[in-house]
């Protein structure tokens, strides 16, 4: 099951040249770029691990591509995404985010159903990867 989070998630994976073009676009807008990774792809897991520091004031996409390459070396089977943050007054938010690497196999999610008080049914989704292995050993 292909995880679909962020921009371009329904398109084929971006090449490094396409990633660099998106980073250049973000930098041309004055947005700060950061690299994040995770091994827990749950849709509500919006706080991924930050790789290094956000690249504030960096104007060269090559620096971001270097950090991405280093993150890929350390996390060869994890999810990696690039975020762009607009710090301008009135926005102050993540304005672009897209996955740049994913595991070769993505096991997907399962639906858990629990009966709670008053015969109410509570549903939640969980990742097969998270259930099967501890953090850091999932892919």
UniProtKB/Swiss-Prot annotation:
GO cellular component terms given for this protein: chloroplast
Signal sequence, renumbered to the chain: none
Other information: The basic functional RuBisCO is composed of a large chain homodimer in a 'head-to-tail' conformation. In form I RuBisCO this homodimer is arranged in a barrel-like tetramer with the small subunits forming a tetrameric 'cap' on each end of the 'barrel'.
Species of provenance: Ectocarpus siliculosus (Brown alga)
Keywords, comma-separated and alphabetical: Calvin cycle, Carbon dioxide fixation, Chloroplast, Photorespiration, Photosynthesis, Plastid
The UniProt record lists the keyword Plastid: yes
Purpose: RuBisCO catalyzes two reactions: the carboxylation of D-ribulose 1,5-bisphosphate, the primary event in carbon dioxide fixation, as well as the oxidative fragmentation of the pentose substrate in the photorespiration process. Both reactions occur simultaneously and in competition at the same active site. Although the small subunit is not catalytic it is essential for maximal activity.
Coarse class of the protein's main subcellular location: plastid
A GO term, aspect molecular function: ribulose-bisphosphate carboxylase activity
Record note on quaternary structure: Heterohexadecamer of 8 large and 8 small subunits.
InterPro entries given in the database record: RuBisCO_ssu, RuBisCO_ssu_dom, RuBisCO_ssu_sf
GO biological process, one term: reductive pentose-phosphate cycle
Compartments it resides in: Plastid, Chloroplast
Protein name per its UniProtKB record: Ribulose bisphosphate carboxylase small subunit
UniProt cross-references to Gene3D superfamilies, sorted A to Z: Ribulose bisphosphate carboxylase, small subunit (3.30.190.10)
Family stated for the protein in its record: Belongs to the RuBisCO small chain family.
């Amino acid at each position: 099951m292909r995880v679909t989070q962020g921009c371009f998630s329904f398109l084929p994976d971006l090449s490094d040249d396409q990633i660099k073009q998106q980073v250049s676009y973000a930098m041309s807008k004055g947005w700060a770029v950061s690299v994040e990774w995770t091994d827990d792809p749950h849709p509500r897991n919006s706080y991924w691990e930050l790789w290094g520091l956000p690249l504030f004031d960096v104007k060269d996409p090559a620096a971001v591509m270097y950090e991405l390459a280093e993150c890929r070396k350390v996390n060869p089977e994890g999810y990696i995404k690039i975020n762009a943050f607009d710090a301008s007054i009135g926005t102050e938010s993540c304005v672009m985010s897209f996955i740049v690497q994913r595991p070769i196999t993505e096991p997907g999610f399962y639906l858990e159903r629990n009966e709670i008080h008053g015969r109410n049914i509570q549903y939640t989704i969980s990742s097969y990867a998270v259930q099967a292995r501890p953090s850091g050993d999932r892919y």
